[in-house]
């Protein structure tokens, strides 16, 4: 009996943040995007009175992959003078893009492209299962990266390479449309409760929807990433170079703190009914 009780998880919590519904990333590496937008989702539900609401993950993931493709190709142009066995060049070709990420990527994408409700741009097979299409896109990017280096070796100017990149990005965009659908530029929406509109439907752009319905919060200014990395000194700020989602965006920036400090902040966040975003690397021992 004792062993059975020990195996039963304790589901009692002293404090709960009001939320509703579970967002499912399926077989994709988009945990960072789901968790990041869930912070805003709870705020939208509280602001509108809706009992359930979801953002379109396919919308922001489309632009995530578009921006990462540009980040890679621009990186190839920036390193065109370096030998092919240069560590940075090797890293670029080994990691042209991924479906993973972190909160600075969420904030940069939302700031640039806004947000849309799930019903405006639904999930597709490829967005729920990212591995297959991601492999195709990586292959295309590596091919284009080599073409840019070859053009540079033949004397192409930086301006000519930039134009070549624009043409390559058109193909990338078309591939993404086939996989995830074409992102909307405007849509009509209004909050619903029990299947009925609570106000007159209004036309939004993704950017105006984020500002007017979601509050338009400056995520980069109002949120910080905390990390517990015992291998590095605590109480210091760390930045991981080139770990970003957009070329002109923010690198992964975090404050390294003892786990006891992070626990205190997490508890304070929950008591304030503010969702605390959590990334973790679980192991069989956890």
What annotation goes with each model-predicted range?
Residues 279-286:
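Conserved small/polar residues in nucleotide/adenosyl-binding loops
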Residues 1-17:
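N-terminal regions that are enriched for targeting/export leaders
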Residues 16-79, 84-97, 101-160, 164-183, ...:
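Active-site nucleophile-adjacent alpha helix/oxyanion-hole segment immediately C-terminal to the catalytic cysteine
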Residues 143-244, 252-255:
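Aromatic-residue-lined binding/catalytic grooves and analogous aromatic/hydrophobic interfacial grooves
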Residues 239-243, 247-276:
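Active-site acidic/histidine clusters and adjacent loop/turn architecture
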Residues 10-11, 88-89, 245:
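Generic signal for short, ordered secondary-structure residues
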């Amino acid at each position: 009996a004792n062993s059975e009780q020990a195996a039963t998880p304790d589901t009692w919590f002293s404090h709960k943040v009001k939320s509703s519904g579970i967002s499912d990333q399926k077989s994709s590496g988009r945990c960072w995007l789901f968790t990041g937008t869930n912070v805003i989702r709870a705020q939208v539900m509280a602001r509108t009175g809706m009992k359930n609401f979801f953002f379109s993950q396919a919308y922001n993931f489309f632009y995530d992959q578009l921006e990462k493709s540009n980040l890679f190709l621009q990186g190839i142009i920036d390193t065109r003078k370096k030998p092919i066995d240069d560590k940075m060049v090797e890293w670029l070709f080994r990691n042209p893009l991924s479906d993973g990420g972190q909160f600075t990527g969420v904030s940069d994408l939302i700031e640039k492209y806004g947000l849309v409700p799930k019903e405006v741009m639904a999930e597709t097979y490829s967005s729920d299962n990212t591995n297959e299409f991601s492999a195709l896109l990586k292959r295309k990017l590596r091919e284009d990266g080599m073409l840019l280096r070859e053009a540079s070796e033949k004397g192409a100017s930086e301006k000519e390479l930039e134009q070549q990149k624009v043409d390559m990005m058109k193909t990338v965009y078309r591939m993404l449309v086939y996989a995830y659908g074409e992102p909307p530029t405007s849509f009509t929406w209004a909050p619903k409760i029990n299947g009925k509109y609570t106000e007159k439907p209004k036309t939004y752009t993704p950017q105006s929807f984020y500002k007017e319905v979601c509050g338009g919060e400056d995520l980069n200014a109002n949120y910080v990433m905390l990390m517990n990395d015992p291998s590095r000194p605590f109480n210091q700020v760390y930045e991981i170079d080139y770990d970003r989602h957009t070329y002109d965006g923010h690198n992964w920036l975090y404050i390294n703190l003892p786990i006891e400090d992070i626990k205190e902040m997490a508890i304070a966040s929950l008591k304030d009914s503010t969702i605390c975003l959590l990334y973790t690397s679980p192991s069989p021992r956890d």
